[in-house]
């Protein structure tokens, strides 16, 4: 039976749906959301908690690029001593995948229907797709400086979503970055509230960053790509995933709200 509190959206693209196996027996929908929210807007979380078998789940994102990033970033992730198995379901990817980038992601999907048991090789070594929906860009751009060496575009996007809806983020080798917002007021809020704030990278490095509105001749914009992508994601698709739309994380609206979710902090 499905875990309680799942919000059902319209039927989505299979490229947006991922399988999550090897979950702890006491996992809840809200816990799964906490693991995956940073990759993008979540449309649905379907938690299967069958009697006599280990729980597993299907997570559906709004954007297929977010699903690819979740597979790339969370397959093999250690969650309370359980090594998560994250991959595309067998029916979700394959020869018909978009632009030739989808076939690699579907390799290990056999476990999707079986509750996290067998299955093939898993998504950890799968190449990320190189094609996707057109990038969403905006003129409401800020330049960020003072980023720590391990700061990635996703760290920056997560930090700046405190101000509003981010549609693009990237970082450069010199410790600067650019962030584009959907709305002008969010850009203004970011400059006012996030300038000289403490930034933390995914590796735990911290630094106080400066945020200012990007001018037409900004020295940062258009430089070489992200440190993290160029160094460790050499097989990433040519169009940066960082360009996908991400909804605001604070200032009122929740990330994702299952009807009966029961929050539980994990340390």
Swiss-Prot record:
Family per similarity comment: Belongs to the splicing factor SR family.
Predominant localisation class: cytoplasm
Compositional bias (Gly residues): 93-127
Subcellular location: Cytoplasm; Nucleus speckle
Keywords: Cytoplasm, mRNA processing, mRNA splicing, Nucleus, Repeat, RNA-binding
Renumbered residue ranges of the record's region Disordered: 90-137, 212-267
Higher taxonomy: Eukaryota, Metazoa, Chordata, Craniata, Vertebrata
Compositionally biased tracts (Basic residues): 224-267
One MF annotation (Gene Ontology) recorded for this entry: RNA binding
Protein name, as recorded: Serine/arginine-rich splicing factor 1
Chain ranges of the RRM domain: 16-91, 140-214
An example Gene Ontology biological process: mRNA processing
GO cellular component: cytoplasm; nuclear speck
């Amino acid at each position: 039976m499905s875990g309680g509190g799942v919000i059902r959206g319209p039927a989505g693209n299979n490229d947006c749906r991922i399988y999550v196996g090897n979950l702890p027996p006491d996992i809840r929908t809200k816990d799964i959301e906490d693991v995956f929210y940073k990759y993008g807007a979540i449309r649905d979380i379907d938690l299967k908690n069958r009697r006599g078998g280990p729980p597993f789940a299907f997570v559906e994102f709004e954007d297929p690029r977010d699903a690819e990033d979740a597979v790339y970033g969370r397959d093999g992730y250690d969650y309370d001593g359980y090594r998560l198995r994250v991959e595309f379901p067998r029916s979700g990817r394959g020869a018909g995948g978009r632009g030739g980038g989808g076939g690699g992601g579907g390799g290990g999907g056999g476990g999707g229907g079986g509750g996290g048991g067998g299955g093939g090789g898993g998504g950890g070594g799968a190449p990320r797709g190189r094609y996707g929906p057109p990038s969403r860009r905006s003129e409401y751009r800020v330049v960020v400086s003072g980023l720590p060496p391990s700061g990635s575009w996703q760290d920056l996007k997560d930090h700046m979503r405190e101000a509003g809806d981010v549609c693009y983020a990237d970082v450069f080798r010199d410790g600067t970055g650019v962030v584009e917002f959907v709305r002008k007021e969010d850009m203004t809020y970011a400059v006012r509230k996030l300038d000289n704030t403490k930034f933390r990278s995914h590796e735990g490095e911290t630094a106080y960053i400066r945020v200012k509105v990007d001018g037409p001749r900004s020295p940062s914009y258009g430089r070489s790509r992200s440190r993290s992508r160029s160094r460790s994601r050499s097989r990433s698709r040519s169009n940066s995933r960082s360009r996908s739309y991400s909804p605001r994380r604070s200032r009122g609206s929740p990330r994702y709200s299952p009807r009966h979710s029961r929050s539980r902090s994990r340390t």
